């Protein structure tokens, strides 16, 4: 099958970015290429055209490949709801919530849909570039594996192992991986690469040769650190943790324990008129914030309790009294109302939780999950916007008479009588340039001519150039069989 797989020596070694760059490089060679990740764990999901969901990293990789995101690109998606359990999405559809022990028992049965999705992609494209998850060196997870070597062997896909020199110990990472995995798994590895190098690459020549000598694997190159990665949609909430910008308007967002779809913040952190700050657990909401954003969450009632435990409810009321603005998105919108009821226990124990009371609305959870892309207009400015909805629950109440937007001919969201508190189910809306500019002007912020989508395209091209300059891309792609 025409495929090659990038696995890593650990999490956050840059696998997702490498696959995105390789997809763009292959596309520029005239190949029909598609990304594929057998199993992902993320609360940052993208909605596909057919109403399914996949990891947002695979959506970015699809964009790099010039494709619409498809559920086959990420057939198994785990969305953590607690420390013990995750919602399981198979081929875009929710199949239930499993505790960790139950997941390990069920995992082997999911190889069939994984191979089914992979087969459809390989039949439709010249090349499929596969991304592993975590590391194959986690040999305690090898039994029933569908994400790394279990998949590679089942699908007969050659593997290139990526190590991360930025965190140190890359020689031990790569040589150690070979030492702990089964010989049959090691035989699937065709080579390695070193990612995130800082400084003069020539200084690592000896270490590079040592890895080749110790493993017998071919090296495909050393990739210098790519700072423009910060301009691409964040895959992990920690990527947004560093304050960005030096603008006059401070935008503070609350780092919930189950934060989801935080890519809403990506366009904002690139606006020069803003300073975007993550409020971490235990920290107060900064008094200088002009806007506080309550982002999405995988557990609205759970994170509402988490919010109160940090004292953020008191901070939000003080912020509102000072004349500050508040925006709730999806789960954050639900929190702003009077109550959040979950009679069927879809996100935890059945029951109801008192909301923050900043909007006169109530939310009731129900099992029908809304997954859809939308286009509409922002009511206050009249500017067009687009985005997506991905939520359970319906929200209603008097403040819905002041909708945030109109989408597909219906009102969406809610606003307080004073206009300073708004809520919406729409993710991704800040990628709409005209709307974003109008919204920020309403806050008194200096706006820019940022064309967000065009910038993402430019960075993907630069990423492909970067890999072409430092990797044997032709040799790596030639591994596909």
Curated annotation (Swiss-Prot):
The active site is at residues 330, 427. InterPro entries: Class_I_gatase-like (IPR029062), CobQ/CobB/MinD/ParA_Nub-bd_dom (IPR002586), CobQ_GATase1 (IPR033949), CobQ_N (IPR047045), CobQ_synth (IPR004459), GATase_3 (IPR011698), P-loop_NTPase (IPR027417). Keywords: Cobalamin biosynthesis, Glutamine amidotransferase. SUPFAM superfamilies: Class I glutamine amidotransferase-like, P-loop containing nucleoside triphosphate hydrolases. Pathway: Cofactor biosynthesis; adenosylcobalamin biosynthesis. The keyword Manganese does not apply. GO terms for molecular function: ABC-type vitamin B12 transporter activity; catalytic activity. NCBIfam families: cobQ (TIGR00313), PRK00784.1 (NF001989). Catalyzes amidations at positions B, D, E, and G on adenosylcobyrinic A,C-diamide. NH(2) groups are provided by glutamine, and one molecule of ATP is hydrogenolyzed for each amidation. This is Cobyric acid synthase. It comes from Cereibacter sphaeroides (strain ATCC 17025 / ATH 2.4.3) (Rhodobacter sphaeroides).
